[in-house]
Amino acid sequence: PGLEMHRVTGVVDVGDEDFRIVVEAQSQVPRVYIEFTVVNAGEEVWMTDFLTGNWREVPPTASPLDFSNLGGTMIDIIYAVESPELLGVESVSGIETRRIRGTIQSEELAGLVPGAGGGVDIDVDLWVEVHQSLVYQMVLAGQVLSTDKPDTERLLLLGEFDLPVVIDPPE
């Protein structure tokens, strides 16, 4: 509450379930743009204080997004899609994908968006790579969190699979 996320970028080590993300957001009062970083390394989660830039250890629930089990979470989301409809084949970043549209219950997104509320239909579009069935893009439209506006959209872009990454806790 009080923050509106505009962009999240980062890297995920699916094998170790570690991630590093940079969150760009805007506070509501006063209207100030802020940026902070979240690192999940092993059992520890660290976040920069957006005022001082200093690192501090935080509980996992403090992260606005949870990529610690991204592979499993994406599978859970795909299986939870209701009334899936194939819209056709589209290119995403030069990759041939199948675009699938359906709905999902907001609580099914709790693995990705901590605090996701229950009982709200969320529209979901998935762009799934034709040959390996990797999700390259996902759009979630609707009120996932109780603090979201009803027309909130979340765009998740995935790519550069199988590249080595090293995610260490901050020093």
Predicted regions and their residues:
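Short small/polar-residue motifs
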Residues: 4-9, 33-35, 77-88, 123
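An acidic-aromatic
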Residues: 11-72
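A mature extracytoplasmic/lumenal domain signature
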Residues: 23-27, 42, 49-51, 90, ...
